[in-house]
């Protein structure tokens, strides 16, 4: 087991500018947009009237992951999140697998969020809008983390105002019927687990807080407080909105709705709120994308430092103190995906990768000693088992695609190890021959 990271051991340190509020807001910006506007309808399709139970399962697993991640982040306050924790606690391979799952899965999620903005702002040119948004937000991140935190705070405020209006309008209308919240015969365990897996994709934004370990002031104190706060606020928002929308639409109509919050306002007779909801959805997806690009670039930075990705990606800008090459490459890849990808496929693939990422986080937390801040063993154990179960409860196409891409990463890791081993053997042989010249 490796010793804790010392900041002096980390080359090209990033600037610590983020406080508790900034860290919480970055987590909120990552979670609220994805969950309310992207995962609610497919989760209802999977769980039917058991949607709220699926939400509860997702919340329990997310809480366990949050506690494990917070304790690990306090122990290892460096950029990279579970990529760093896995390497330090379980070994290089598991850290690499977590990092690969995060970078690839969240890159797909970035494309999904960019396309969400495009479909709400200009459906006829959704892909073009998505690419433009990616370019703009990459520029914001390139200019410095404080600008990103300020913009994220503004986006979260707008989204919360819109969601509050939706909840008040839904509960205040005559269309809301509490009987629609009852669990019927259509609810079954597998469907609730699948819904929990889809909703967990929405909860996963607190990972972005952990990946910013080098940019948070007093990370040992700030991160363990920020992660549960962000998760708790998000859960409260999800529960209020989900109950309101189900009470108006019912689970079956919710499952069929392309834009469930807009549909709920239409049924409730509050048509003037529909364009406000559409703008809120676009802004929420924008907030998610902003934080996603931020987190993916930081994990790319950490992997590049360890040569699991090309070393030149680890460069930190001398003025802005951000991993500018990693951000530019991530932005370019996301822009390419946004120009060509299907949004549903991107979300499904991302969910599998995120659950694998957190499974490794919980396994890492299980190895912490009591003097290292380990949570009660039940917490990471429930988180680990929950992540594995929810990952394989996802639709078969998502599981197959996720497993295939993770397999590519494992193969790349193995090839790299073989090449490195042979290079070392060659160097060792050359050294021995130079030290023992043959007699002639």
Curated annotation (Swiss-Prot):
Family statement drawn from the similarity comment of this UniProt entry: Belongs to the amino acid-polyamine-organocation (APC) superfamily.
Organism: Mycobacterium bovis (strain ATCC BAA-935 / AF2122/97)
InterPro entries membership: AA/rel_permease1, APC_superfamily
GO molecular function terms listed in the Swiss-Prot or TrEMBL record: transmembrane transporter activity
Transmembrane segments: 24-44, 47-67, 93-113, 117-137, 155-175, 183-203, 229-249, 276-296, 323-343, 346-366, 379-399, 400-420
Broad class of where this protein is predominantly found: membrane
GO cellular component terms given for this protein: plasma membrane
Entry keywords, A to Z: Cell membrane, Membrane, Transmembrane, Transmembrane helix, Transport
Location in or out of the cell: Cell membrane
Bilayer topology: Multi-pass membrane protein
Function comment: Probable amino-acid or metabolite transport protein.
Pfam families: AA_permease_2
Name of the molecule in the record: Uncharacterized transporter Mb2022c
